[in-house]
């Protein structure tokens, strides 16, 4: 879905922000050569573990060294040693229950966090999910992430991130807003807020987001699932609405009908 979204990005932007950065997938889908005026790339996430991970990603070689220091389950080894599950539980308990705050890049904590989130089912809550024993059938996603830290195209994206923030979305948008800013907003979806890790996001926050976006000087694109109040906050005769059907990967099961969803992109341009 990221490739579909970035097709709508204005190519004359000078500042790019994601107030709900998550894993920054839309940014990583951008062909940076198409944005010759882009001077500032801003990642933000209210989750301090995501914030710390992306502070570390700005120095990919140092983060790669931290990831290399932690053994992980291997392709072709069907009898996964118990130490990997034990390490997963240890790191899961440590990073999610410690009240972690990062004032400077903490590479080892970033590696431990990556160890957990790459070994749970896609779309699940990493703080409560169980370890996936791949039984040697697949390559661990932890290793795939580690490899990206030395691949030129990925390294270019990592090192061009200019600012990493741990702010409330409104503070982030106001701080970086300008006539040449593009805000991509992927807010927690309506009625699924408790699904997201390390923060709450309620009806009041959805309305607060709508209010701040209505006042920006720059351009914004916001992805959501459709719900009734959106039509009040962003009337279709005042904002551009685009829709796309997509397969819900997290809900897909073998030999069953694919579960489909509709992604909605609302723009002020």
What label would you give each PLM region?
Residues 41-43, 164, 240-243:
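Conserved beta-strand scaffold positions in the cores of enzyme catalytic domains, especially
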Residues 12-16, 38-40, 158-162, 214-220:
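Short active-site oxyanion
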Residues 19-21, 44-45, 165-167, 185-187, ...:
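Short His-Asn-centered micro-motif
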Residues 25-29, 50-53, 122-125, 173, ...:
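Short catalytic/ligand-binding loop motif for oxyanion handling, primarily in non-cytosolic enzymes
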Residues 1-4, 60-184, 188-194, 211, ...:
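SAM-dependent nucleic-acid methyltransferase catalytic core
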Residues 198, 202-269:
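Long, positively charged, glycine-interspersed low-complexity recognition regions
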Residues 8, 12-93:
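SAM cofactor-binding core of SAM-dependent methyltransferases
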Residues 5, 54, 114, 220, ...:
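A residue-level signal for conserved active-site and pocket-lining positions in enzyme catalytic cores
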């Amino acid at each position: 879905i990221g490739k579909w979204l970035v097709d709508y990005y204005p190519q004359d932007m000078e500042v790019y922000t994601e107030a709900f950065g998550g894993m920054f997938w839309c940014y990583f889908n951008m062909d940076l050569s198409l944005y010759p005026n882009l001077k500032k790339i801003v990642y933000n996430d209210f989750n301090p573990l995501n914030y710390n991970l992306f502070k570390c990603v700005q120095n990919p070689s140092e983060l790669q060294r931290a990831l290399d220091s932690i053994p992980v389950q291997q392709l072709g080894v069907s009898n996964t040693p118990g130490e990997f599950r034990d390490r997963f539980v240890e790191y899961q308990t440590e990073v999610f229950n410690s009240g972690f705050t990062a004032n400077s890049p903490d590479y080892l904590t970033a590696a431990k966090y990556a160890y957990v989130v790459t070994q749970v089912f896609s779309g699940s809550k990493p703080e409560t999910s169980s370890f996936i024993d791949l039984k040697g059938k697949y390559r661990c996603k932890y290793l795939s992430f580690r490899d990206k830290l030395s691949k030129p195209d990925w390294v270019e994206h990592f090192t061009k991130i200019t600012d990493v923030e741990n702010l409330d979305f409104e503070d982030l948008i106001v701080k970086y807003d300008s006539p040449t800013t593009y805000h991509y907003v992927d807010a927690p979806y309506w009625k699924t807020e408790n699904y997201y890790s390390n923060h709450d996001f309620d009806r009041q926050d959805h309305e607060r987001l709508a209010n701040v976006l209505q006042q920006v000087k720059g351009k914004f694109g916001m992805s959501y699932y459709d719900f009734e109040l959106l039509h009040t906050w962003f009337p279709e005769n005042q904002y551009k609405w685009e829709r796309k059907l997509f397969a819900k990967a997290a809900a897909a099961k073998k030999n069953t009908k694919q579960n489909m969803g509709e992604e909605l992109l609302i723009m002020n341009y």
